[in-house]
Regions:
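Gram-negative/organellar outer-membrane beta-barrel architecture
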Residues: 19-25, 29-218, 222, 297-307, ...
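Short beta-strands and strand-coil junctions in structured, solvent-facing domains, enriched
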Residues: 4, 16-20, 40-41, 120-121, ...
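Extracytoplasmic/secreted envelope proteins and their assembly/folding machinery
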Residues: 6, 10, 26-30, 254
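Acidic, glycine-rich low-complexity/disordered segments
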Residues: 1-22, 175-176
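C-terminal outer-membrane beta-barrel translocator/porin domains of Gram-negative envelope proteins
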Residues: 70-72, 206-214, 218-320
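Hydrophobic transmembrane signal anchors and adjacent membrane-proximal interface regions, especially
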Residues: 15, 53-55, 202, 248, ...
Length: 320
């Protein structure tokens, strides 16, 4: 291969040689390899050997390196936007991918990802994103104290979040994704509902360290019929420029677990739950768990909760 390493291919197949595998493992590995869209042709053969069959895989690399996509988006939080995605492969190294998502509309957003995929070896990534929105919310990020003092029951809030991450991750025992990294975050929250000297709630920079573990055997991302899902991460906030003069070091743990089982041709049972809590010193209210709304992507500790409006329930712990 000219543009991909052996470690990259084995990482996508999720098995190492020499190893005995069954047909389901082979099928899953080939599907994973095909999903990368890095190969225009994938074929394999089994050649008899003294102690079994030897698997040989033939790959034809896709010559396309750059992809441009457009889309339209609307939700109740970010409103309408034109979406632009640019993805370029092999920018500097054989196994790297650079992706840029840009949302142009009522609230400008971007998401930048650069990832060097080394398969079963340690892989390296850089992420940067910016999110902003304006919305009437029924949380004051202060346990309701501000609402009690002012007599208000909602705030028109301008929210801005710039987050940058560097991280490493690998596949452990060919099943579990583990990783760790450092995060820089700039957070600004303000409102026009209050007096001039009280309009800015937050205007701080934060430095934190994080680690995570993920396992996903669902056979379909959105409508699984069989499999398990587990995801857990811990983030420790180590430093803040401390605009509010209330910062102490603290940590946040979050987890998600799910199970799906197909019982009949058209019947599947799916059970899923997630929870989170803070520990250590008293947490910063702006990193509380805030539930409500819908969508595919979330930031910070915002969590979807169908049946409730966006950003309507908040607390330093939750389970659903």
């Amino acid at each position: 291969m000219d543009n991909y390493t052996r470690a990259y291919v084995l990482g996508k197949l999720r098995f190492k040689a020499p190893k005995e595998i069954d047909y389901d493992e082979l099928k899953t590995g080939i599907n994973n390899l095909n999903a990368t869209q890095n190969f225009s042709r994938i074929s394999y053969s089994l050649e008899p050997k003294d102690n079994g069959n030897e698997l040989k895989i033939n790959l034809s690399e896709n010559e396309n390196k750059t992809f441009l996509k457009f889309g339209l988006h609307y939700d109740g939080l970010y409103k309408s936007a034109i979406l632009v995605n640019v993805t370029h492969k092999k920018s500097m190294f054989k196994n790297d991918v650079l992706s840029m998502d840009l949302a142009l509309g009522d609230n400008i957003r971007y998401n930048l990802d650069y990832y060097i995929d080394n398969g079963f070896y340690w892989s390296f990534g850089i992420k940067s994103r910016f999110n902003e929105f304006n919305r009437n919310v029924k949380t004051d990020f202060n346990d309701g104290t501000l609402f009690e003092q002012t007599g208000l029951n909602s705030l028109n809030m301008d929210f801005s979040d710039l987050t940058n991450q560097i991280y490493v991750q690998t596949v452990f025992i060919q099943k579990y994704l583990i990783g760790a990294g450092l995060e820089h975050k700039y957070l600004r929250i303000e409102t026009e509902n209050l007096e001039e000297n009280s309009r800015v709630f937050e205007n701080s920079t934060y430095i934190s360290a994080f680690g995570y573990l993920k396992y996903d055997s669902f056979d379909n991302r959105y409508f699984p019929k069989n499999g398990w899902l587990f995801s857990g991460d811990i983030q420790s906030f180590l430093y803040s420029s401390d605009y509010t003069k209330e910062f102490d070091r603290f940590s946040i743990a979050k987890g998600e677990i799910g199970f799906a089982k197909n019982f009949a041709k058209k019947w599947t049972l799916k059970i899923q739950s997630e929870a989170g809590f803070s520990f250590g010193n008293e947490s910063v209210d702006f990193f509380d768990f805030v539930l409500g709304g819908y969508g595919n992507q979330t930031i910070n500790n915002f969590k979807h909760f169908l049946g409730y409006d966006f950003l309507i329930i908040s607390g330093d712990s939750f389970i659903k």
